Amino acid sequence: SMDLSKYEAPKEIFQFCQFKDYQVDLLVNNAGYGIKTSFHNTSIEDEENFIRVLGTSVIMLTKLFIPNMIKNGGGKIMIVSSVASFAAPSAIQPLYGPIKTFMNRFSDSININYKHKGITSTSVCPGFTVTGFHTASGVQEQMDRVPKFMVFSAERIAKEAVDATLAGKSLCVPTKTYKFLVFMLKNLPQSVLRLIGTGLAPGRYDRN
């Protein structure tokens, strides 16, 4: 395992693959967590680590592995984002949604710049998924209150994500439930999204 909050981690992962002579033609960026405490109560160091894991490490790993993909005539990149990237920024801890929105745009940029070289990037935007994410982030109790029809198994999400990535799709929103939700989020006025975000935020995370 590797701690992606450490600046050198992406380079060490790449060097390990080189040492083992691995030919990486499918890169999956799927590291993340949430911060329970309010923005003003979180240390700058914690915020920097958060940005590094969810954002900077994705950019660095993609940048490190793309040259070999070009050399080998193509490759696939999966960037695990979130439906939070389409929601009001305040719906989940202040940095989470905006970072995921940035990841979507970054994935689009990879497609624009490298699709003609046989490299495609897929931004995967799942909703609530049964993993260790919420327990590790300290919000499992809140997760348990989410309606069952909005919670899906990791296996189902992974299958749709892998299929979309191998097919070279630019965006994957797993399950019809979240496809409909994202459609609504894209078409609702920003004023309505802000109201939704304000309503969702209290009680989901530490607001002290």
Predicted features, each with a name:
Residues 62, 99:
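Active-site helix of classical SDR
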Residues 38-40, 46-51:
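Substrate-binding pocket helix/loop in short-chain dehydrogenase/reductase
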Residues 87, 109-120:
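Active-site-adjacent segment of SDR/Rossmann-fold oxidoreductases
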Residues 30-35:
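Conserved NAD(P)H cofactor-binding loop of Rossmann-fold oxidoreductase domains
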Residues 82:
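Residue(s) in the substrate-gating loop at a strand-loop-helix junction
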Residues 123, 144-181:
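C-terminal helical subdomain
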Residues 1-12, 44:
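The beta1-alpha1 cofactor-binding region of Rossmann-like NAD(H)/NADP(H)-dependent oxidoreductases
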